[in-house]
Amino acid sequence: MAEASFGSSSPVGSLSSEDHDFDPTAEMLVHDYDDERTLEEEEMMDEGKNFSSEIEDLEKEGTMPLEDLLAFYGYEPTIPAVANSSANSSPSELADELPDMTLDKEEIAKDLLSGDDEETQSSADDLTPSVTSHETSDFFPRPLRSNTACDGDKESEVEDVETDSGNSPEDLRKEIMIGLQYQAEIPPYLGEYDGNEKVYENEDQLLWCPDVVLESKVKEYLVETSLRTGSEKIMDRISAGTHTRDNEQALYELLKCNHNIKEAIERYCCNGKASQEGMTAWTEEECRSFEHALMLFGKDFHLIQKNKVRTRTVAECVAFYYMWKKSERYDYFAQQTRFGKKRYNHHPGVTDYMDRLVDETEALGGTVNASALTSNRPEPIPDQQLNILNSFTASDLTALTNSVATVCDPTDVNCLDDSFPPLGNTPRGQVNHVPVVTEELLTLPSNGESDCFNLFETGFYHSELNPMNMCSEESERPAKRLKMGIAVPESFMNEVSVNNLGVDFENHTHHITSAKMAVSVADFGSLSANETNGFISAHALHQHAALHSE
């Protein structure tokens, strides 16, 4: 009996009488290794399987004809020539004509371990055609199945099984049931009420139908009914004629009159049961108290009602707020009081000096009158201060810039090498009401033991601006410059001595290039040179610094 073997160059192999020694490689040994725990798990899994179904399948396949068995496993039937010849021959002759398909164990192992594609085809049925030669192609014309053809074979097997069971693929295909023909018919309710349930016998009543009369006609009708019933006071108080509230009773009367507007107005006005749900008119005093409380407490209507508007309920205050916010009165209120806008909420690098100057001048002028609070108008600024503020022009600013003395030439680093007496015991004078806001606190680099321009507090201090040593030889020239200016009238600027407005450097060596000083004074209308010290000592210090860096 000739034994089949695989050629080294052909994956399918051919029949040969030569025997080859099988030497397993390292990869084969790696895959062949198995752990004892894995074997025990597989044995436990096999014990739980039911092999009765497999035995029944094998017995069924043993009684099947050869053609049906080949078709069941995906093989094509034999060609007619072979079929005719086999029909006339006996089973023993047919067995003699078949090739010898016995395989050596080594050849089977080589076929199983030759690759990943062939590992999946490890059944004996798949191996049978792989070892046949061209002589067996007449009986088995179909070669070994590959992975690409496996899906098609599975589909054909499924179709064969469906055909054997008597169900066509069209019958097994699911269909989405959408359409009128799939809707269920719900029969009328034929149940009975329980003993505790009460049968609903009342008839529902239509109160309003909005699709009959135009919306503009309905609004005119509601306005007319509100004017006839005395609600015109509220309409005059809150932007007359622009906002209309729904009146269900008036709409119901219009429906009962078959949408006859004239008849509905007469019946609604003559009917004593006509609803007066609209809020009563707010007096001018109540409106002013509400607006004043809104500035103090915000939208806390409980505090508004408790402290200012005690004649109204909290609900009435809330309703009035929403109607008042849509009126022209709110626009006037917001314009006069800046309601809803946070003051001084500007860009960090921009300060509204004039706005703050006016506001702080009002605060120094005394308490605001009660009449000014109720009318929500700020107290008028005194004429003297207005004249001073209006006197500032571009020429004044130019004069202020030119009047400030330059310490030295910015291009000369060693310009301030002269000695300067220490000022450790010099008292500090405080300046009140200098409405200047810090825009940027300048930090200059230091070198060696000297701290270059360290301000201990923000404010203005006494100093003697004589020749002083502010730059050391070791210190480097800073990249930033300190700029300051004095915002006062020119006449006052000529009288005030610079010695009264200085900086105490606490006996430190500092490095400053081309410094200028800036002071903004509010109450300077009647000041003179003799009254400067009194002005400086009579006010509290404002913790602000006027420093601008270039």
From Swiss-Prot:
Comp. bias regions, Acidic residues: 154-163
Q: Where is the composition biased (Low complexity)?
A: 1-16
Output a single Gene Ontology CC term carried by this record: nucleoplasm
Q: Where in the cell is it found?
A: Nucleus
| One term of GO molecular function | histone deacetylase binding
Q: Which SMART domains match?
A: ELM2, SANT
Biased composition, Basic and acidic residues: where in the chain?
A: 17-36
- The modified positions for Phosphoserine read 52-53, 114, 156, 165, 168
Phosphothreonine-modified residues are where? 163
The Polar residues compositionally biased stretches are 121-134
Which domain of life does the protein's organism represent? Eukaryota
Q: What's one GO BP annotation on this UniProt entry?
A: negative regulation of transcription by RNA polymerase II
What is the recorded name of this protein? Mesoderm induction early response protein 3
Give the originating organism.
Homo sapiens (Human)
Name of encoding gene: MIER3
